[in-house]
């Protein structure tokens, strides 16, 4: 997973909750090309952050999905559903004007991981 591009932690534990900072489609320090590839890389980065914290997708209780083109919702949703399987945490999907480094999708997550 790429290092954060600004002054923040990729994830932070507060009691029994782990907050995964917004992840974009960075691989080896570069943004992957295209919304589908970015969505897959974003979810891989989220999974890696969760694993570092001792958890996985099944521990996620809430996700925020940001996209620069709400017209990509169905595509991003299908990739998200592949990753999460039967687990359906609460989620918001938000259209935004821009994301860091020209990303097309960003996802942050909150997981419940009792210590």
Residue ranges with predicted function:
Residues 1-115:
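Short, polar/acidic, helix-capping and beta-turn segments at strand->helix junctions
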């Amino acid at each position: 997973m790429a290092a954060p591009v600004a002054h923040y932690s990729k994830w932070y534990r507060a009691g029994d909750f782990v907050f995964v900072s917004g992840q974009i489609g960075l691989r080896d320090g570069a943004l992957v090309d295209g919304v589908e590839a970015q969505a897959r890389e974003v979810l891989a980065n989220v999974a890696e952050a969760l694993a570092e914290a001792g958890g996985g997708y099944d521990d996620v209780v809430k996700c925020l999905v940001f996209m620069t083109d709400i017209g990509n919702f169905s595509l991003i949703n299908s990739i998200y559903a592949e990753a999460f399987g039967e687990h359906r945490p609460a989620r918001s999907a938000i259209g935004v004007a821009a994301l860091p480094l020209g990303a097309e999708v960003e996802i942050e997550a909150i997981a419940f991981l009792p210590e």
